[in-house]
A protein has these predicted regions:
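Eukaryotic alpha-helical solenoid repeat scaffolds
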Residues: 1-11, 16-29, 35-197
Length: 197
């Protein structure tokens, strides 16, 4: 999907959701349509279809920017964890999609710049959560290292280096060694960097 088309689709979706939210009697909470859209976008980030991740990612960024009260970063990350669970019975391509989905969800949260709007304590907790998640995914598959590094650099630009380093060290110590050296899907992984470029 071409970038211009993704942006157009995201803008159109946001417009519809703004109308639905304004007509709903759910002040401060997501209306039914908005809640459904959140679930659909997050789950869509694990889609194996070409261009789907970029499209869903662009829409999720705009949704997070547009609905700061109705859509929390915590709820998005929780949806990610619930809908993209890794299981031992998964085949290689399915696990690959789940891992890419988790990385792309983190990317959307970071690109929305929502972290900068939070108070220091909750922001630190969320940054640590994001760093842990990204390090976990990078440790599972080597073909995610390039994409994950780009996203971590974006996060670094939003936080004082000393704070982020401390969080990364804590996350690394807690994660432990669990690297999977299987490079399946490595060729396709490079193109996905577009979402965070």
């Amino acid at each position: 999907v071409e970038p211009d088309k993704r942006v157009t689709a995201a803008v159109s979706l946001i417009s519809v959701l703004q109308q639905a939210q304004s007509e709903a009697a759910t002040a401060g909470a997501a209306c039914t349509d908005l809640a459904y859209a959140i679930r659909r976008l997050v789950r869509g980030l694990a889609s194996p279809r070409d261009g789907a991740r970029q499209g869903f990612g662009a829409a999720l960024v705009e949704l997070l920017v547009t609905f700061p009260k109705e859509v929390t970063v915590e709820s998005v990350l929780t949806l990610m964890e619930e809908s993209m669970q890794l299981q031992g019975s998964m085949k290689g391509p399915e696990e690959r999609d789940m891992l890419f989905g988790r990385v792309f969800t983190c990317a959307a949260v970071i690109r929305s710049a929502r972290l900068a709007t939070l108070a220091a304590k909750p922001r630190a907790a969320l940054v640590e959560r994001l760093v842990k998640e990204l390090l976990f995914c990078l440790g599972k598959k080597t073909f995610l290292q390039e994409l994950g590094t780009v996203i971590l650099c974006e996060l670094l630009r939003q936080r004082p280096a000393v704070e982020l380093l401390a969080e990364a060290v804590r996350a690394g110590h807690e994660r432990g060694p669990d690297r999977d050296e299987d490079d399946e899907g490595g060729v396709g992984g490079g193109g996905d960097v577009e979402v965070v470029a």
